[in-house]
Amino acid sequence: MTEAVNRGAEQVEDSTGTTFFVPLPPDGRYTRGTYQHDAVTLAIMMLGSVLVRRTEAGIIRSRIVETEAYAGPEDKGCHAYNGRRTARTETMFHDGGTAYVYFIYGMYHCLNVVANATDKPEAVLIRAIAPLTDDDEARMKQFRRIRSRKAADLCNGPGKLCQALQIDKQCNGIDMMHSDDLWMEGGTWPGADRIVCAPRINIPYAQEYESKLWRFYVQDDPYVSVNDKQAVPLTAAWSALYEAE
């Protein structure tokens, strides 16, 4: 594996003239400290990073282009809202860098990366990825078994990307810092001016947290699952991202 090198943080000025710093992922494999940021920060940081999956057909590398943050016990959209600790959510209470995989609608798996430290149940849902090479795309097609002419259909949604990468409940609980089957590496962060924020998808039960701008994606990337016409640039939304209700 590639040794990680800390790249520090990028200084950005928002629309009000306020300066903020976005931590950047390392060169090489993610470290424990990288995963231990809060979910909102990690969700932003993960954009442009490389998700690596070892499959029976070989290694597949993909670029993360869309994420959602789930911010723990106070977040009514989070599985661990109000400290809910069940057999299903137990993985969220593990250390940052643990894979949290769950099954929805009786047919799809979703891959999340646990954020923060042990017993601070936050996570980042990976909503969309893009294959890095033609070989990566070919392996994804093998597992998705689709003939769509639109390459983005392979992995422009959380269920689709799990099928394309052969991710299921057996991956739940994997420590992505040490695993040889599933891990993340720092890629090329797109920059604050290319990232937009929007409300998370399909969480009507989250009440006032439904409108939180905790979905992040690379603007105009063809692999993004849903482009929101009301999306707000990261540089305009930064101060609101961390406001408590």
Labelled PLM ranges:
Residues 2-245:
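Conserved, well-structured core segments that form or line functional sites
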